[in-house]
Structure formats: C-alpha cells, structure tokens
C-alpha cells in the first residue's frame, strides 16, 4: 500500500485551509440543506432543477471537505526557523530577473495546496518553483517550461 501524499505547506496556508473547512462544514452545509428542503417542497423530483442543482452542490462541497481533511491530515508544515533565510525554500519570497521578458518578478514559494499563480504564489512542485528551491542570491537557473526553457537570476531571497 502506498504512503499518503504529504502536502508541504506554510503555517499561513494551513490556517487558510482550516478556515475554509470550517466555513464549508458550518455555513455551506446548512445553506445547501435549506436549498434541498425548499426544492423538496416543490414536489416531483423528476423535473426539479433546483433539487438537482442543490444535490450537485452538496456533492461538490462534501468532496471538497474530504479533500481538505486529507490535505490537513497529511500536511507537512515548513518551520521557517529551521531553513536558512538566504536559501530558497517553501515560504520564501524570491525576486528574480526573468531573462526572457527582461523584467524582475517576485514569487512566493508555497506548497502545491496553496499555489495561486495569479498572486505570484507558485508551487514548490512547479517547474520554476522546483528550480528555485535550494538556490541563493546570484544563482542563475534554467527551467524547462511548456514553452521551452526559461532563464532566471535570483536577486533577493526573503521570508514571507
């Protein structure tokens, strides 16, 4: 039997997942139960789109609850005090020079469960995140990405 996947996370990431889990269990479940009650009051379920929609939403929420519980149960929280501040790790804020676009970009390296590329939070498992892990200021890395190879120089490493 394979071992459960460990989810590398920052303390902040764990807190956000715990808050989402609490919201889904306490607020969202009640909302959906009410929607189902209202839909049932309409009678015939064979053509009751409100009922179908509420049951689909319930299935999605219950699936997300199971997913969050699993992620939290298997979380591996990065202790930022144990990692040198000048080495890129999960929890680092890294400023890099992107040679392809000739611009400076700042990334926050997070576990895959916390990744949010729109807010420059990249996973330690992504090509760029993986390439940056363990590096320090002045290092130049080349990363294979879907479009080819990207080249970055690490300009700054800070803690989130």
From Swiss-Prot:
GO biological process per UniProt: DNA-templated transcription elongation; regulation of DNA-templated transcription elongation
Pfam families: GreA_GreB, GreA_GreB_N
SUPFAM superfamilies (UniProt xref): FKBP-like (SSF54534), GreA transcript cleavage protein, N-terminal domain (SSF46557)
A GO MF label: DNA binding
Function noted in UniProt: Necessary for efficient RNA polymerase transcription elongation past template-encoded arresting sites. The arresting sites in DNA have the property of trapping a certain fraction of elongating RNA polymerases that pass through, resulting in locked ternary complexes. Cleavage of the nascent transcript by cleavage factors such as GreA or GreB allows the resumption of elongation from the new 3'terminus. GreA releases sequences of 2 to 3 nucleotides.
NCBIfam families per the UniProt record, alphabetical: greA, PRK00226.1-2, PRK00226.1-4
Similarity annotation: Belongs to the GreA/GreB family.
This protein's name: Transcription elongation factor GreA
Gene that specifies this protein: greA
């Amino acid at each position: 039997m394979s071992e459960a996947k460990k989810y590398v996370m920052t303390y902040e990431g764990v807190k956000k997942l715990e808050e989402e889990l609490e919201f889904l269990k306490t607020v969202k479940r009640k909302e959906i139960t009410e929607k189902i009650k209202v839909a049932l009051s309409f009678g015939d379920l064979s053509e009751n789109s409100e009922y179908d929609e509420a049951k689909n939403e319930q299935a999605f929420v219950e699936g997300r609850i199971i997913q969050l519980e699993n992620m939290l149960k298997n979380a591996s929280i990065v202790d930022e005090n144990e990692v040198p501040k000048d080495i890129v790790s999960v929890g680092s804020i890294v400023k890099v020079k992107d040679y392809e676009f000739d611009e400076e970009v700042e990334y926050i390296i997070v576990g895959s469960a916390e990744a949010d590329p729109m807010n420059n939070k990249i996973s330690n498992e992504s090509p760029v995140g993986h390439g940056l892990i363990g590096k320090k200021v002045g290092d130049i890395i080349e990363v294979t990405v879907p479009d080819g190879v990207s080249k970055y120089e690490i300009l700054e490493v800070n803690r989130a």
